[in-house]
UniProtKB/Swiss-Prot annotation:
Localization per record: Cell membrane
Protein's name in the database: CASP-like protein 5C1
Keyword Transmembrane helix: yes
Keyword vocabulary terms for this entry: Cell membrane, Membrane, Transmembrane, Transmembrane helix
Location (main, coarse): membrane
Taxonomic lineage of the native organism: Eukaryota, Viridiplantae, Streptophyta, Embryophyta, Tracheophyta
C-alpha cells in the first residue's frame, strides 16, 4: 500500500489527484463567477480569454475528478501509459493557457487601476482582482497535477 501510494501520489486515480482536481474546479469556478458578475468584462479581450479558459478547465477537472472517484472506489487506478500521456498533455496545455489568461487579466486590471478608477468602478475592479487571483491558484494546481502525472510516467 505504501509503495503504491508513494508511486502514485497525485497521479490519476489517487486521493491526491482527486483533491487537486476538486480544488482546480473550485478555484476555476470562483474565477469564472467573480469575472462574470460584472457585465463589463466583455469590453476587454483578456477578461474574455480568462472566462473562456476557466470554462475549459472546469469540465476537464470535473471529468478527471470523476475518474479519480471511480478509481478510488473500484480500487484499480487508471494507469494506462497512453491515457496518462493524454492527461499530462491536457494539463500542460490548460496550465499554460491558464497562466496566460491570469497574467493578461492581472495586467489589464493593474492598468485599469492606474487610471484611478475612471475606467473601472472599485466594485468591479475588486471582483476582477479576485478572479485573477483564483485563476492563478487554479493554474498552480493544474501545473502541479501535470508535474505529478509526468513524474509518475517517468518513474515507470
Amino acid at each position: 500500500m505504501e509503495n503504491r501510494e508513494r508511486a502514485g501520489a497525485g497521479a490519476v486515480g489517487s486521493a491526491g489527484s482527486l483533491g487537486l482536481r476538486v480544488e482546480q474546479a473550485v478555484f476555476s469556478s470562483a474565477s469564472l463567477l467573480f469575472m462574470s458578475v460584472g457585465v463589463e468584462f466583455f469590453s476587454y479581450t483578456a477578461f474574455c480569454f480568462l472566462v473562456t479558459i476557466m470554462g475549459l478547465v472546469i469540465p476537464w477537472s470535473c471529468t478527471l475528478a470523476m475518474i479519480d472517484v471511480y478509481s478510488i472506489l473500484v480500487g484499480c487506478p487508471l494507469r494506462v501509459p497512453g491515457v496518462m500521456v493524454i492527461v499530462v498533455i491536457g494539463d500542460w496545455v490548460l496550465a499554460i493557457l491558464s497562466l496566460a489568461a491570469a497574467s493578461s487579466s492581472a495586467a489589464v486590471i493593474d492598468l485599469l487601476l492606474q487610471f484611478h478608477g475612471s475606467h473601472c468602478s472599485p466594485r468591479f475592479c475588486g471582483r476582477y482582482q479576485l478572479s485573477a487571483m483564483m485563476a492563478f491558484l487554479s493554474w498552480f494546481l493544474t501545473a502541479a497535477s501535470s508535474l505529478f502525472n509526468l513524474w509518475f510516467i517517468a518513474s515507470r
